Structures are given as C-alpha cells and as structure tokens.
A protein has these predicted regions:
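Non-catalytic, solvent-exposed segments at the cell envelope interface
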Residues: 2-350
Length: 350
C-alpha cells in the first residue's frame, strides 16, 4: 500500500471513528433524556396524589381487617400484588375549591360533602366486584370522629350520611361507613369534579345509553332517550343530575352513576394502556391530579399494584346495587336502611 493509500485509509478510519463517537454520544444523550423524562413523569404523577392517614386516626376500634396475601411484585418499581377480598370506599367530592371544580360544580359552596359514595367490594380472586351505592340522603347515626386539629366531633342522630365528610373529612366518612355497615374499609379513594371530567376526556369520552329523556337546567344537561358519547363535562353533569329524571330524588341519580361506572370500565378496556405510553400518562395524570387516598395507596407503585391485581376484572363481572332502603318515617325526603336486607348485604361483603 502506497503512502497516499495509507493516508486515505487513515482518513476513512478517522471519519468512521468520529461518526461512531457522535452516534454513541447521541444515543447516550437520548438514553439520559429518556431516563430523566421517565423519572420526572414518575415523580410528577407520584406528587399529584394527596393522602390521609386514616388508619392512624381511627386506631384499632374498627371492624376486623380481611387477610390478604401479597404475591411477587411485577417489577422493582411496583409494590407486591395483593390477593384476597378488598373493600374500598370511593367518594366523589362536591368540593368547589379550585377554579375547575367551582366552574364544573356550579354555584358556590362554603363546604364540601360526599356527592357520591360507593363501597367497592372485590372478591378474593380479584375477578368479580360488587359496587354498593349509599344514598347521600340516608339518615344515619354519625359517630364521634377524631379531628386533625384535635378533639372530636359529637355523635349525631338522624344525620344525613353525606354530612360525615363535611364535618370530619375522609376519616369521618370512613368511620361512618364502617359504623353503619360493620365492614372494614381497606382503602379510601376520593376524586373531585375536575378529576372525573379529566379522566373521561383522557379516555376519549364515554358512551352511555339512557332509557328516558333527561332535561336538567341546573346541570345544563339535555339528552334525548338513546345512546350518547359524552365528554368529561357532560358525563359529570349526568352523574350529578337529579332534577332531570324520575322524581328528582338521589335514588334516580344513583342509577345513572352506576351506569357511568360500568361504561367507564368498558371504555378503559378498549385502550391497551400498557402499549400506549402517551395515553397511559394522560389517563394516569388525569386520575392522580385530583385524587386523595389513604396512606396505603398514596404512591404510584401502590396504585399500579392495585391495578395489576384487578386487571382481569371486566364490566360484565361488576354488579351494581343500592343499599336497601325505605322512606324515613321522620322525613319523606330522606331514606333509612331497610332491615334486615341492608345488614344481609353488608354481611355478604365481609
């Protein structure tokens, strides 16, 4: 090989070396950026979640806790996947705090109450679930509840169920539910107006079928009988309407809420979120941004663990019922638990 050929070869080797070095640096930069982005996303979603230490506040004077057996975690970032039956109190808060909630809630309210209350029972195999709606107009004996500021609330007789949240927050809501059901709430999940609307929008809307016309000027919802694809604001209005259907009571509205829950489960099942990181982030961000949980679910890894344990749960495997009730003798606009049917229902969830 001549001197000229040697020089040309050295130049080619040098160029290849520079190209490989640039490619390596680019790849390394992309990897660092990807890891940093993933880390930021995890931190952001994790920091969205607000929590309340309900177990510490209520202590040991509670119904017995169901035994669960954790299985191996699916990944290092996820908590062990639990098995065994599970009872979760899910509340929809009518808080008007924040611009979005005030706009979606309509009007003004000096305090928040539980606008929707559901006890979600997941069976031991995590393949079936029963959702029991508790009418917010139910008259109950509200127990004394500890306050975060110190002291406690007084026992209240013939109190509306949804006042438990307004006087004592999540802790009192859980204690009241456990008092009237005799069932230990393993977890607590609360979502507000804005969070519900964002979730529906992140999923691309939700499809529902109404069996009658709905005309509610208060919620600005007007739907003809039939099938509709609703955006977040419309779905929230449907969940909250009570004057546009039936006799205007909370019982008619509960039926719509239960229909929406099953429709949302169906909508979620149409998305393969694990293979669509962008959609997964949108949905997770929408949920966690307006979420309050107990400390047992206050991290993304714990929520992922719960999600993995029920990933085989379909809308068809979910039964929705309302706590058996009758008109309250003291007030025709209120209801009380119908016995022994209500006690029998709660017993079946233990």
């Amino acid at each position: 090989m001549t001197d000229t050929e040697n020089v040309d070869e050295d130049r080619r080797v040098g160029r290849r070396s520079r190209v490989l070095k640039i490619a390596g640096l680019t790849l390394a930069g992309a990897l660092v950026l990807g890891v940093a982005t993933a880390g930021w996303a995890y931190w952001h979603l994790n920091s969205n979640i607000k929590s309340v230490d309900i177990d510490s506040a209520l202590g040991t004077d509670r119904p017995a806790k169901a035994v669960t057996t954790p299985s191996a975690a699916a990944s290092a970032s996820a908590a062990p996947v639990p098995t065994g039956s599970l009872n979760i109190l899910v509340l929809g808060s009518d808080s008007r705090s924040g611009k979005e909630n005030k706009a979606l809630g309509g009007g003004d309210s000096s305090g928040a109450r539980s606008d929707t209350a559901m006890v979600v029972h997941i069976d031991a195999g995590r393949k079936k679930a029963t959702i029991v709606s508790i009418p917010r107009d139910t008259l109950v004996t509200r127990p004394s509840c500890p306050l975060s500021s110190g002291g406690s609330t007084s026992v209240a007789y013939n109190a509306m169920f949804n006042t438990a949240y307004s006087v004592g927050g999540p802790v009192c809501a859980v204690k009241t539910v456990e008092s009237i059901t005799g069932v230990r709430m393993d977890h607590y999940i609360e979502i507000d107006f804005a969070g519900f609307a964002k979730l529906v929008n992140a999923l691309g809307g939700v499809t529902v079928t109404t069996t009658q016309d709905i005309d509610d000027d208060d919620s600005h919802l007007h739907l003809k009988k039939g099938t509709h694809h609703l955006n977040g604001k419309q779905a929230l209005a449907l969940a909250r309407t009570r004057h546009g259907i039936g006799d205007g009571s909370d019982l008619g509205r509960i039926g719509l809420q239960q229909m929406l829950v099953k429709a949302l489960l169906t909508q979620i099942s149409t998305h393969d979120l694990l293979t669509d990181p962008t959609k997964l982030y949108e949905v997770t961000d929408a949920v966690t941004d307006s979420l309050t949980t107990d400390t047992g679910l206050d991290s993304l890894s714990e929520l992922i663990s719960l999600g993995q344990s029920v990933k085989g749960l379909s809308a068809d495997a979910v039964t929705t019922v309302t706590m058996p009730n009758v008109t309250a003798p003291s007030d025709p606009n209120r209801v009380v638990a119908k016995e022994p049917a209500a006690s029998d229902l709660w017993e079946s969830l233990r």
